[in-house]
Amino acid sequence: MRIFNRSTLIEFWNKHPDAEAPLRLWFSMVEHASWAGPGDVRIMFGAADFLRDNRVVFDIKGNTYRLIAQIKYGPLYLVYIRFVGTHAEYDRIDASTI
């Protein structure tokens, strides 16, 4: 998958150093994936929540952090990082429109 907005992850882990290793792992796993549809995401990330408009919420570091990505499945294989934040920050946003 081709991932856009990696800088969002870097900015976040600079503020929350304990998030760096889990976010790097997420990035590496997604970068090497080839998701044809939501089922492929579910196989890799069983706790992911699926929203409208191909948005997916990923739990990072045991649900301490949340990451929202919008996915263009194959043949494009694109992932747009829309949000990364603490659980409290996530609770204050509309995950389906961010």
Description of each model-found segment:
Residues M1-T64, K72-Y77, H87-I98:
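Basic, Lys/Arg-enriched alpha-helical interface segments
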